[in-house]
UniProtKB/Swiss-Prot annotation:
InterPro entries: ABC_transp_permease (IPR001851). The chain crosses the membrane at residues 7-27, 45-65, 70-90, 91-111, 118-138, 162-182, 212-232, 240-260, 261-281, 288-308. Disulfide bonds: none annotated. GO terms for cellular component: plasma membrane. It comes from Photorhabdus laumondii subsp. laumondii (strain DSM 15139 / CIP 105565 / TT01). The keyword Cell membrane applies. It is a multi-pass membrane protein. The complex is composed of two ATP-binding proteins (LsrA), two transmembrane proteins (LsrC and LsrD) and a solute-binding protein (LsrB). Part of the ABC transporter complex LsrABCD involved in autoinducer 2 (AI-2) import. Probably responsible for the translocation of the substrate across the membrane. It comes from the Bacteria. Keywords: Cell inner membrane, Cell membrane, Membrane, Transmembrane, Transmembrane helix, Transport. This is Autoinducer 2 import system permease protein LsrD.
Amino acid sequence: MNIGQRYGWEFALAALLIIEILLFGIANPRMLDINILLLSTSDFICIGIVALPLTMVIVSGGIDISFGSTIGLCAISLGVMNQTGIPMAAAIPLTLLVGAICGIINAALILYTGINPLVITLGTLYLFGGSALLLSGISGATGYEGIGGFPPALTDFANLTLFGLPMPLMLFLLCVLICWLFMHRTHSGRNIFLIGQSSKVARYAAIPVARTLYLLYSLTGIASAIAAIVLVSYFGSARSDLGASFLMPAITAVVLGGANIYGGSGSIIGTALAILLIGYLQQGLQMAGVPSQVSSALAGALLIIAVVGRSISLHHHQIRDWIQRWRNQRLSS
């Protein structure tokens, strides 16, 4: 298989991304400013940080829709720890631990109950979200009021640049590299595809299914914690609703990036390109004066188109055979 066949979908996404930027640039020349393009990634790049390990979860045949609440819980946990005087050098690793525990809870419930991951993570979505609100109330911040008072070392992070790139974008690129190397260049990563194709066969082949799922859901929790830390730095406060709007664009990016929603196939590079495609779509529409409700509707339509288009591309041989049989029947009649 040559590189064009292997990465054809990724090349198509890259071409669509360039076309999208050029079209929005015609409507608003500011969209072609490289500085605006780079700085605007901070508005949506945290979705990509979570979508990368979510890709691996979906490839394994699972799903996690609780990451939005995990982000809120991790953000509030960081705020409470800051309020109690715990230094950031300790609070940040503890926040990552909170995210990992959330992922472990998801994996444990899925493995030991045998219930569909969608149902389990729907339950933990409310569990983690309620816990975030409870912690927020204990800290004295009622409802969705934020917890502030973070040190400048944290709040300045999201505004820093490295080699001309915003730090959140650099962090995202680092996550892309790590996830790509793990998923496509390690034995454990290749096991993810086998588990997604058939977990029963994977168990018969002595693949550590349970250990792999614990790892994947933990990585999603840790990524949610990283996103929470970046969001707290970006907004300067911790709120329980910071990840509330991440669910639809993250899943859309994973599916648009080439992942089979039923498991067995997917691409980290595809997800990364899809995040940029969706993010710049929303940015371009906002700069064009399109209401946010319309951009949300377009994101939903994009998810449907991605699922249908990917399904057609995966089953084009069967579709072609069906069309040929239908034509033969018409001719014979």
